[in-house]
């Protein structure tokens, strides 16, 4: 009884963790047997009390937290404000997503924290409360889902779904919430079916890698270890203790002169407490990494057995235990309910709050303006910043650490408890982050603008990928667009009044022209959209005006001037103009039926400089027979050397060499028959035959002469050469005359008579056998080429003279190269010469015209006749049309910046939409011509009243660069406006003349600031659009065949009695961008966002636009001024997000690490870290042997990194796995090296995978250095690269493994467990271990001097041992110097 009296009575609630602690203390104190006896009594007590209480769970026990309603309401309010900010362009999509997730995460966490106090106050004996908070059943997360809110879910890929589940399971879920819940929850099909098997397969692979690792020795004698430092607080206390307990020391631990622990002592709780108390130097512990046994492990490197707390027994199969320990939590945790831990929080940020109301003061030079990750403006401080908060009687000082955000401005008044700064937590950098790309898509179509300079990203210099250097807005100026199959053409002058309904979707876009006195007079109209299918044409005769050619150059045939009938054979890209001219000198040409000028334009519409515009086949140069074309004479070398007309991508181009004068050429006729191999030939090679000799059964020769038969591939070519045969006397005389042309008037060289030739002849040497040869003299038809038909006269000269110095000139060229055989196919004739019309234009430096133009045929209907015009635009860029094969209506655009876009609605299907819009407004508009700054091209804009919004009238508005007089004339013209909101609109054109050039200054404005500042002019002008009042803008920029839909312009008239929001008057300048809700006049309407289009004395017109915010480093797609369509990618943000902490996302990540698949973040971090290490080492030790140690350190470093990554995933789930299990696995993955050179050729092959220790030992035995490279094998590859082929074959690819093993004659020593199980032997583990293994002699511990100033703090000292020979040979003198000095220690934190 006396003993009982001394016991202390603890009156406390004991929960799961307390019981764990109690049990471990009991085991330490009383041992196993007694502890189990105590625990039996505790169990009996527990059951007895539970029965007496009759505890049970009912649905009424789930009490909802009362504060939930207003918390959720508050979060919704915040989300709404956030949505607005995003709409105004203050935050971008990524920031919005981040902030909304954090808002809901915080709400959910508040609710969770409320839960425990709520239960304690309202119902302390609630069964749910008792069970979950004691740890008996369920955890806080699960109860929170039952009575709080389910919160945010993540989808199976680990991305957060930003719509939170606000209900809890007690209230029941709505349909949407239920679907999200199924998508993200752990009970889905995905998890039960797929992930369980994944976890099982992971376990199988893990066990496969390490099944042969058994404890087979007490001590391997290593002197290496991994150092863990108690001083550095990089590790949480709990993990530090967990790392140390159960390990064995690799080195003596000194405290001053006193040794407090010796080498090979195992670490218990008492020793850890002593280490923590003394704050000793780094502690070096032994790990499986440092064990020197090749294929097993020793007791001391493994440490205590987790089951009974003593050193591990010999024969323990620790490999299989390790594999199971890592795989097992996976199978358990896949089916867990969802856990929202730490997603997107990016390290919990601590807030600094103001203690009382007052003014803030700090040094502004030490801070730098930036944006927080939520898009709020803030200041970033680089070093410690002192912030002073002053009120009337108190002064409070706060120190804010570096890298923190200051959320207030200098001299700002703050209220009590207001957040003034956000401090990044220390754990921030340790988080596993992955880089995610987020694409932002345009949700409207229109024209793109930037409000800042944009850099080309270096790897895509010539593409449309740009990098933003600073935070700025991208604007999409509104306006729809239509794509056209033909190039739209239109001829308008400035200030024209027009009314056109230009887009006629069903019919071709045909306008009517009448040609009078060489002036083109237009009646502009088109058919109205009515339900009737016939063509109804309205003629607005009062709109007739003489309109000169604007940007387009028309080249039209002179025939049009004479109003002669024009019959054009129409193809899509080519037509032929028949000759009907009655000039005498050309009459003979016209007799031939086939003659005619062909004009052809490449299918893509691109016409190159000096390209062929039209060609004419002269009938005088046609031949009916095959033959060979030759140029020039023997004396005059042929000028054109086998150059053909080069056709590439459908573009005909004449090379400059062609335009040299070939005054005459020669045609050598020959008869050619092409026969199949099987046909029987009735004549012999080199025989001479007469006319009409049968050659095969059904063909006869048309000329007589020498027969030559050649076999080519799968056919036989039989040629008949007409001409005379001579047998020359001496061989060398004739050799140089084989295959030459001899002009008339020369003597024959190969006969004794000197006869003069009358005609040209062609001499060719023929060798039927080796000794015999003879000469064949063949007749030749010479052709003279005159200057040719002057095609240029067909085209009037004026369009070329006026502009751009375009020239047409006729060029004759020969279709066949010198000495090239021409083949006649069936009954066609061969055209030898073609006369071409070459179009070129001057390329002087001032007008920077490209090498290419856009050309197209335009069909014009005049008085019932259809005329064809050729339209040529000199442009810089172009768009190709590619017709899809099966779909005639859809076409794709590929512009020259390589961005592909598919036109979703083909041309013919827009009829129904267009008709509805067409019926809306019929009013007049005004054309205005915009001039580009470098005067390359003009463009038109037509504006009308119904599509602008207007602000005004203002009295005090200041304008930039605007002449007041031009504003004061404000003639209002009446406009017939059927459905527009207003009856009047100012005559827009007047103001354009003075303001329009200003639009090129790219100004922007920032919401909330009333001073709207000018930005510097950065870019080219607006693009050129033609706006029709019926709701479309026609893009008149000739480089794109795209018509833009109407710009939404709105007119605003505020009331006259108004006051300004600020005393300073708002400055509005033309072309400036205004964000939504910028207040210009107090009583005026709230503006929509847009670009100021027109400024007048009392009002402004704004073209509506949508801003998108982009932060530095974002990638902008598309060019400035480019037309974008809905759904096009606009910007790509790259941002870092914390890995989702859920184990189901965790398992694939564990597997990625173990299988060494490269994920961006892992490979980046590891490689960078290793590079950094190698640099450090060489800096510390000097180059030569820094590399040797660098290799060792690389392996050690990557091993530690892998262990930490795997631990991280499990710890985030509250799963405790001892490091040594993971270390055993990682050791197997990293223990192989790749033999790189043939330095070891007598032992290993290059490219062979061998164990690291084996390579080192072989190197020492052979006394030569080995070249090898450390490799990370994945667990699958490691399982297939073991010493036992039976184990490999039973894992995967059985046939391949066995076949290889047979070829190599491998021997399996049956050292592992699996081989023995397969063959039915006794496994070498446990009791079977002693019988099988003969003790190999224990290695004597290598005695190395371990002084206090040891090398690398006990980390790498045995490098000397491994590479002693290498060191001795190279550095025998250096070592003596270095041994005396102390080296800088390098430590690996086992964190």
From Swiss-Prot:
Q: By its UniProt entry, which Pfam families does this protein fall under?
A: RNA_pol_Rpb1_4 (PF05000), RNA_pol_Rpb1_5 (PF04998)
**Cofactor entry:** Zn(2+)
Q: Quote the subunit structure annotation.
A: In plastids the minimal PEP RNA polymerase catalytic core is composed of four subunits: alpha, beta, beta', and beta''. When a (nuclear-encoded) sigma factor is associated with the core the holoenzyme is formed, which can initiate transcription.
EC number(s) of the enzyme?
Answer: 2.7.7.6
User: Is Zinc tagged as a keyword?
Assistant: yes
- Write down the chemical reaction(s) this protein catalyses: RNA(n) + a ribonucleoside 5'-triphosphate = RNA(n+1) + diphosphate
What's the protein called, per UniProt?
DNA-directed RNA polymerase subunit beta''
Q: Which GO terms describe its cellular component?
A: chloroplast; DNA-directed RNA polymerase complex; mitochondrion
- Major enzyme class: transferase
| Gene Ontology biological process terms, A to Z | DNA-templated transcription
Question: Which cellular compartments is it found in?
Answer: Plastid, Chloroplast
Belongs to which family?
Answer: Belongs to the RNA polymerase beta' chain family. RpoC2 subfamily.
Binding residues for Zn(2+), per the UniProt record?
220, 291, 298, 301
Q: Which UniProt keywords apply?
A: Chloroplast, DNA-directed RNA polymerase, Metal-binding, Nucleotidyltransferase, Plastid, Transcription, Transferase, Zinc
Q: Which HAMAP family match?
A: RNApol_bact_RpoC2 (MF_01324)
Originating organism: Gossypium barbadense
A GO molecular function held by the record: DNA-directed RNA polymerase activity
Note accompanying the cofactor annotation = Binds 1 Zn(2+) ion per subunit.
Q: Which InterPro entries match?
A: DNA-dir_RpoC2_beta_pp, RNA_pol_beta''_euk, RNA_pol_Rpb1_3_sf, RNA_pol_Rpb1_4, RNA_pol_Rpb1_5, Rpb1_funnel_sf
What the protein does comes down to:
DNA-dependent RNA polymerase catalyzes the transcription of DNA into RNA using the four ribonucleoside triphosphates as substrates.
Q: Which CDD domains match?
A: RNAP_beta'_C
